[in-house]
Amino acid sequence: MAVEVVQETLQQAASSSSTTVLGFSPMLTTLVGTLVAMALYEYWRRNSREYRMVANIPSPPELPILGQAHVAAGLSNAEILAVGLGYLNKYGETMKAWLGNVLLVFLTNPSDIELILSGHQHLTKAEEYRYFKPWFGDGLLISNGHHWRHHRKMIAPTFHQSILKSFVPTFVDHSKAVVARMGLEAGKSFDVHDYMSQTTVDILLSTAMGVKKLPEGNKSFEYAQAVVDMCDIIHKRQVKLLYRLDSIYKFTKLREKGDRMMNIILGMTSKVVKDRKENFQEESRAIVEEISTPVASTPASKKEGLRDDLDDIDENDVGAKRRLALLDAMVEMAKNPDIEWNEKDIMDEVNTIMFEGHDTTSAGSSFALCMMGIHKDIQAKVFAEQKAIFGDNMLRDCTFADTMEMKYLERVILETLRLYPPVPLIARRLDYDLKLASGPYTVPKGTTVIVLQYCVHRRPDIYPNPTKFDPDNFLPERMANRHYYSFIPFSAGPRSCVGRKYAMLKLKVLLSTIVRNYIVHSTDTEADFKLQADIILKLENGFNVSLEKRQYATVA
């Protein structure tokens, strides 16, 4: 089509001029040359191997040169998400799109997703993650190859269960502190995400980073807000064609704002690392645990597909183990000449874990509170479970043993993560051609494959009544009958979230403390939610709740 248009343009230009080509005006010559170049490029693109290989994959209508890149022009993050979901509903579980010459293939079938996530063939993160490079460097989220494998191996043990148990009192202290701060909002509607965001930053600083004295004033909230703004900027760069080009982006006001946000973010983490190195006393921070026999592992079954190195570390340790939390472990490794670890590695991983460990759980906890505010019957069941655990002393500190009894609260958290996964998609670059399991499609090497957790979690063939908030979706008997890649809020396989157990424990302690202190109300319904996915799934119109103080009888 594009070739025919150019031919017609050339014929019109030739017939309207009695001069030779040498007589064309410079403007006309430039126009004709540009059109010819564009036509040749489009002809080459449509005859390329990758274009022909994916010709049978459904897609929205595309424009020459641009593909579907024009679709995002002028739209907000919430509008982009809505349009994208609309296309997926129309074109089915597998869809392709072109951002210029960049091929994207979207997957929502668990059998296809298993091919991407379960093995070691397609571990390379997509090109779209390069916009995180100034922030995360070569941290776990975006690194590849030997560097990623080495860092994963060294960092995973810092999230061992014995370390997590030691964090519970700190989780409790910060949960009680945010309960007190939120008391000032009691009786009125407010955005709870602001409180969750600051609290999760403080918890990370006090636990994984080992900070003794938290930043004064609103520094934690300032950092959290800078992270939100930086995610918005990176998302714009990923979906807006012109912002993808460094040569254009560097001259924009968006880049100026990004520089300001990065100064705030790196200023905080640099200070954290500097403080920890200056005050590092390894023996006072170490946890020594004697394990005589390994923890009994789950019998091999199809659920084995979702196991990862975190399970192996927890279950197979024997003997005396000396453990350090994340930043302390990295400081010690950097001092050891026999370990491949340096100062840049420390900064890269601190920036990565600070982002992954706070923004995701602040969104998850905020969504959970909103859902309990909307579904009062479910909140009542959560409270009843808390009553059964805490008895007549409902305001005592939570323990690790208590969290193990919170089966219904855990199901509420999992159901929240099903409907509103904080990370709504995963992007990988194929290292080999891939034949999909769900249909007659072969995706070529080099393609950016996007796994859409948000859509997988709402498939009606997997979750009957998929938009209903139903914690019983995570009863063991229901889970046993589902494909094990049909629920992947923490990803799965070798590149699963290294902090998933940390996140679940933190969410249990935080939500338990809030629910035991307050009745959560919401004037919004799920129909009022305006979802936006700027890296992390959030609500454009805020996580609005109100709180009512619970009253307990005092013992005379």
From Swiss-Prot:
Topology term for the membrane: Peripheral membrane protein
Location in the cell: Endoplasmic reticulum membrane; Microsome membrane
Q: Which PROSITE patterns match?
A: CYTOCHROME_P450
| Predominant subcellular localization, coarse grouping | endoplasmic reticulum
How far does the signal peptide extend, from start to end residue?
none
Q: Does the keyword Ribosomal protein apply?
A: no
Please list the residues that bind heme: E356, C497
The name under which this protein is listed is Cytochrome P450 4g1
Q: What is the organism of origin for this protein?
A: Drosophila melanogaster (Fruit fly)
This protein's gene is called Cyp4g1
